[in-house]
Regions:
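Positively charged n-region of N-terminal signal peptides that target proteins for export
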Residues: 1-4
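General helical structural elements
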Residues: 6-7, 56
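Short beta-strand segments of immunoglobulin-like
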Residues: 38-42
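Bacterial N-terminal signal peptides
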Residues: 7-15
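Bacterial signal peptide processing site
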Residues: 18-19
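Non-catalytic cap/lid and distal C-terminal segments of serine-dependent acyl enzymes
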Residues: 25-32, 43-70, 74-370
Length: 370
């Protein structure tokens, strides 16, 4: 039965990028990630990008997009110019390199990624509008929640998405998704880069997802993060918000490092979480980690597949089609399925970056709390 539900919801989710040709560029447009009023960078109809940098005294200037470097040429006005190759749709970090020094672009908004505040450009994808704001959709809120951690002996901040109906239905209680960022990012990532609130608002407007809270927490706390999440974050959220405080109404998901945490914390605590999403995790292989060992990582599955499946309402794994992790992830999924696990697996166009993660979230939340 679970497999049938997975298949139906997956087909519905695929429709998100199969509609009218929204996102098609017919003339150069300023990037949505530019600081307001800045003309450049500009995205061209072929998805190449024109960058301009005013640095008349510099000796050499280049743009570094995800480690691909584009040397720039200085024009007569002292402005450095380059047009890149066509870019893949989605969100990409970039840096300027001026006389060998890597800097952020003063024309771009800044986003925390690569463990620094980085410039970025968001390339539209033709036909994909599930993460774009729409005028006639009720808007939820993203609330900054500050709280004290006895474990860290420090103040922490998490962000909480609250659906638009929350204040108008004071007697209603809500399930909760705990959504984790990747390495080199922080609790702002799923809001600013991932567009979680927009994705949720659009799905709720179409009645394709259940109203829920989404908690986005800082996960780079070393070995203490699991303790903080289980013993401090979740009790704090349950005390301050109207939640349904049981495992069937609680989910955990994350990208890359956050996907590994969803396994090591979420999957290992079925009394807390009955819904797990793992997006592009390196724990299955494809990066520098040791090969995935099913007997070591999931002995409970091998011991009792039926109990393993009964503990989970949704077990979801995804990866980008050109992510180095894809082959190893698919092999791990097949090994777990052979052992009896019921898993939904999806692969999306793209590498280890935000467009596949946005699509993963969009698909995953439609499966939750049904």
């Amino acid at each position: 039965m679970k497999r049938i539900i997975y298949a139906i919801l997956a087909l519905a989710a695929m429709a998100a990028c199969a509609g009218p040709q929204v996102g098609v560029i017919t003339e150069p447009v300023s990037a949505s990630t530019n600081i307001q009023g800045r003309e450049y960078p500009k995205i061209n109809p072929d998805l190449s990008v024109e960058f301009r940098v005013n640095a008349p005294e510099a000796e050499a200037v280049a743009v570094d997009i995800c480690s691909k470097v584009y040397p720039m040429t200085k024009n007569e006005e002292g402005v450095w110019v380059v047009t890149t190759d066509p870019q893949e749709p989605g969100f990409h970090y970039y840096f300027l390199v001026i006389d060998g020094v890597r800097l952020s672009d003063p024309s771009s908004q800044l986003f925390f990624g690569c463990s620094v505040m980085a410039s970025a450009i968001d390339i539209p994808e033709a036909g994909c509008d599930f993460y774009l704001p729409k005028k006639k959709v009720d808007r939820g809120e993203v609330r900054m929640q500050r709280y004290w951690s006895d474990i860290e002996q420090n103040w922490r901040v998490c962000y909480v998405y609250v659906p638009a109906e929350y204040e108008s239905k004071p007697d209603k209680r809500y399930p909760v998704l705990y959504l984790q960022h990747g390495g080199g990012e922080d609790e702002t990532g799923w809001v600013r880069q991932g567009k979680t609130d927009v994705i949720m608002d659009n799905l709720l407007a179409k009645r394709k997802a259940e109203p829920m809270l989404v908690v986005m927490e800082f996960g780079q706390s070393g070995g203490d993060f699991g303790k903080i999440l289980l013993n401090e974050t979740i009790p704090m959220i349950d005390s301050r918000y109207r939640t349904v405080a049981d495992n069937r109404h609680r989910a955990m998901a994350g990208l890359s490092m956050g996907g590994g945490q969803s396994w090591s914390i979420g999957l290992k605590h079925p009394e807390v979480f009955s819904n797990i999403g793992i997006f592009s995790s390196g724990m299955f292989g494809g990066v520098s980690y040791a090969p995935f060992d099913l007997a070591k990582e999931a002995p409970e599955l091998l011991a009792d597949p039926q109990a393993f499946n009964d503990n989970l309402d949704v077990f979801y794994i995804s990866c980008g089609e050109t992510d180095p992790r894809i082959t190893h992830t698919q092999a791990a999924v097949e090994a777990m399925r052979a052992a009896g696990a019921e898993i939904h697996f999806s692969a999306f166009p793209g590498g280890h970056e935000w467009q596949p993660w946005r699509k993963s979230l969009h698909e995953f939340v439609q499966m939750l709390f049904k």
